[in-house]
């Protein structure tokens, strides 16, 4: 392993998909930048980016019903879905750029075409899905979305969810074939590998950030400790990005920036049921998302997914949420307690007071027996057999608690960038939709922290080579949207309709 440099233009804390993506983008825009990546664990992509720590959905809001809430008048609001949908286009364009230039030799090393479906049962849910399809299919971003209430048609799309189902049960499904299953762990390794082939980049595993302070010259002094030897080194950095997943809050607090005052985290653990039986997994080729129970949080949306990891096809069902005080899967049970500061106690108490539905949901999930969990799977896959499935622990998700002038504190389920006043430090907090929008988040970091470089004489030309639709609203420009998706589908070997 290379020696830790004394100075670096950029320090990336965490070696997951977020840091790997931002590092890739910055080195594409300015190859002369010195970039140092720091990771506590032995390798990159070992926390939430690791393949079995997430669902591997290329989240484009094709099938996730929590992005399309129903209004009181019965209509469906697709605003959030369109945002997520076009944010995923940024990731597709970045990946296509890297494949085209040879930085990623084969897209099938991390990406596989996989239809995205929504599936519901019951009269009210069928009516909702019918209205949702009507509104989404009318928009160019969802061109080609199919809808059916016919069990034979749905069985042709996904036989396991129909076989053994009670005849006459009202059911409905939508399908869009342009979806994807993504191995974000494999992608993280590919991104870090191509970064390591470039001059000016170094990654240092088994090194933990223990202190962060501003120097007299305005640069950041990042103190890291070798977890094996306890030896400490300090790096002087012009810009610091904390993309450490659940560990980002700790880095934000260490930075001492006033913009981070009041922020806290609410950790949620996850459990999957996993099936590796070839005769079963080969018969299901889709990511099938259902409808969460009324009043439950977005993280509770159940889904039955195709996963392709290391060339092996498996099925995943879940998630079942739980509570753990860890902020990282490889973290400490003291993480939550250590994160409590005088400035964030009141926002945390306000969330405990106001978000009782989340507490009720988590208590219910924790108290669920294995029989209850398996019954939920059989709601999707009626003929599922217990001996074919095993439990798997997912990655930790740390939801954002932030100060709010009206409610003192609020709980948010998205992601948020918290930056210093001079934009020399930024931390990425939150959990969803996460990895799918890593490239979009990288664009947000550029706009927030490097806006002076986004000029025709600066990075703009290279940025538009990498992301050809940069500056174009794909929600409004149907031709640009279709052209981009046709081009990236061809390069990435995805289906296009």
Curated annotation (Swiss-Prot):
Keywords: FAD, Flavoprotein, Oxidoreductase, Tricarboxylic acid cycle. It comes from the Bacteria. Its EC number is 1.1.5.4. Belongs to the MQO family. Its cofactor is FAD. One of its GO terms (molecular function) is L-malate dehydrogenase (quinone) activity. Pathway: Carbohydrate metabolism; tricarboxylic acid cycle; oxaloacetate from (S)-malate (quinone route): step 1/1. It comes from Rhodopseudomonas palustris (strain ATCC BAA-98 / CGA009). GO terms for biological process: tricarboxylic acid cycle. This is Probable malate:quinone oxidoreductase.
């Amino acid at each position: 392993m290379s020696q830790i440099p004394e100075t670096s233009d950029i320090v990336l804390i965490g070696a997951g998909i977020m840091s790997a993506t931002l590092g890739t983008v910055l080195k594409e825009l300015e190859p002369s930048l010195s970039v140092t990546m720091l990771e506590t664990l032995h390798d990159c992509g070992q926390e939430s980016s690791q393949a079995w720590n997430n669902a591997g959905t290329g989240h484009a809001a094709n099938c996730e019903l929590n992005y399309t809430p129903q209004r009181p008048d019965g209509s469906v609001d697709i605003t959030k879905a369109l945002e997520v949908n076009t944010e995923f286009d940024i990731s597709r364009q970045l990946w296509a750029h890297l494949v085209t230039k040879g930085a990623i030799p084969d897209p099938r090393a991390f990406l596989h075409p996989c239809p995205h479906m929504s599936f519901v049962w019951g009269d009210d849910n069928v009516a909702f899905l019918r209205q949702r399809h009507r509104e989404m299919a009318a928009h160019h971003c969802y061109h080609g979305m199919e809808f059916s209430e016919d069990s034979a048609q749905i069985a042709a799309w996904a036989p396991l969810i129909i076989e053994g189902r009670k005849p006459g049960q009202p059911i409905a499904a939508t399908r869009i074939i342009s979806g994807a299953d993504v191995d974000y762990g494999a992608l993280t390794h590919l991104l870090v590998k191509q970064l390591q082939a470039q001059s000016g980049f170094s990654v240092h595993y088994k090194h933990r950030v223990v202190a962060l302070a501003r120097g007299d010259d305005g640069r950041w002094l990042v103190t890291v400790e070798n977890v094996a030897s306890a030896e400490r080194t300090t790096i002087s950095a012009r810009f610091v990005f904390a993309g450490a997943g659940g560990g980002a809050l700790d880095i934000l607090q260490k930075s001492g920036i006033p913009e981070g005052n009041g922020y806290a985290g609410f950790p949620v653990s996850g459990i999957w049921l996993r099936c590796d039986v070839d005769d079963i997994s080969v018969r299901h080729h889709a990511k099938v998302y259902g409808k969460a129970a009324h009043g439950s949080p977005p993280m509770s949306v159940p889904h039955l997914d195709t996963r392709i990891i290391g060339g092996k096809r498996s099925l995943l069902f879940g998630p079942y949420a739980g509570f753990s005080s860890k902020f990282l899967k490889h973290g400490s049970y003291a993480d939550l307690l250590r994160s409590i500061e005088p400035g964030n106690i009141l926002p945390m108490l306000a969330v405990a007071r106001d978000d009782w539905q989340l507490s009720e949901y988590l208590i219910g999930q924790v108290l669920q027996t294995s029989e209850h969990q398996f019954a939920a799977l059989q709601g999707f896959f009626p003929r599922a057999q217990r001996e074919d499935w095993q439990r798997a622990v997912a990655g930790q998700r740390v939801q954002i608690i932030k100060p709010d002038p009206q409610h003192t504190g609020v709980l948010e389920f998205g992601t948020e960038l918290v930056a210093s006043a001079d934009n020399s430090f930024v931390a990425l907090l939150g959990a969803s939709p996460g990895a799918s929008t890593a490239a979009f988040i990288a664009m947000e970091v550029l706009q927030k922290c490097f806006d002076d470089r986004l000029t025709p004489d600066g990075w703009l030309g290279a940025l538009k080579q990498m992301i050809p639709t940069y500056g174009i609203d794909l929600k409004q420009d149907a031709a640009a949207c279709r052209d981009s998706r046709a081009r990236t589908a061809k390069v990435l070997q995805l289906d296009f309709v």
